[in-house]
């Protein structure tokens, strides 16, 4: 094993699964903040791949300041209309000229952003419901980093940190899978469900409350009774889904702000609240593992859109999560591991200033019994840090 600064220590408190109160949130792919995350990351991958294809290197860029300004809509039973379009501004920096060649960075970004919206949002008319704009400052050619050269370890661009944890608790699994399956397989056969699905899980002792906000699509809602049926169907689906992950009691609540007497309901024309007064920004929603987990250490860094070569705010959050998963899967006797990686600007990213694992072990297993195995697993993952860059560019790792 190398001389990397790796620490392993026992956690001072209970595993999250054993705490009295647990809160978990996920903002779905159609939430305005997550729309920004998705576009920023898609544009990031497109730029990185273009640079590799043309120059064999990932040049300097960042797209992690993407913003969304909500539109205005008039939803109605059977189908309403968008009155003022959603405005999306892809903001950042990109290298537009390198080695004597000009690079159409803005055009690449615009195409990637529109392709993402077209793929993810079937109820959004790209011709009239949304405006996509791109504003890139010039990146620095001096900050280029060669990607793909064996033994080339990038230097950290910042003194910053990333965090990750494993395994997911029952509540975390329920929350993440509820959104992913509602906006995935369920929405495919039930198009009344829009892409803006927000899920909040609260576990109090052995009872889990799952509160789901679902943007219903007005085109598929002819009247209030049909809306009520759609809400009831979602509730039943999520209840059955939750039972796959827990034996605890689960209560599912759907669109709790509805007032049926006043016919004030969560009805949308496009399937996202971005059509009506809900703005968005990169990094204000899900962390790198797709969840918001106030019971856990979290980084405030926006992971999506950052350069995947040496930007610590991206790499260390993704790597911390991968390390935690590897430790939980490969080392016997681990009940919970929470990982922190701290960089120092200018140092190789495979040599963090400190790599710290805080561990809860199973009954009868002391941390000292497994410390060497944990350190070895962390060391192996750090040695392979550049694989995070490859996975991100190829789209194998999600950042939101």
From Swiss-Prot:
Catalysis performed (reactions): L-methionine + ATP + H2O = S-adenosyl-L-methionine + phosphate + diphosphate
Keyword Nucleotide-binding carried by entry: yes
UniProt-annotated binding residues for ATP: 137-142
Keywords tagged on the record: ATP-binding, Magnesium, Nucleotide-binding, One-carbon metabolism, Transferase
InterPro entries found in the cross-reference section: AdoMet_synthase_2_family (IPR027790), AdoMet_synthase_3 (IPR042544), S-AdoMet_synthetase_arc (IPR002795)
Top enzyme category: transferase
Cofactor(s) this protein cannot do without: Mg(2+)
Enzyme Commission (EC) number: 2.5.1.6
GO molecular function: ATP binding; magnesium ion binding; methionine adenosyltransferase activity
Tagged with keyword Transferase: yes
GO biological process, one term: one-carbon metabolic process
Pfam families the record matches: AdoMet_Synthase (PF01941)
Metabolic or biological pathway: Amino-acid biosynthesis; S-adenosyl-L-methionine biosynthesis; S-adenosyl-L-methionine from L-methionine: step 1/1
Similarity comment: Belongs to the AdoMet synthase 2 family.
Protein role: Catalyzes the formation of S-adenosylmethionine from methionine and ATP.
The protein's name in its UniProt record: S-adenosylmethionine synthase
Organism: Haloarcula marismortui (strain ATCC 43049 / DSM 3752 / JCM 8966 / VKM B-1809)
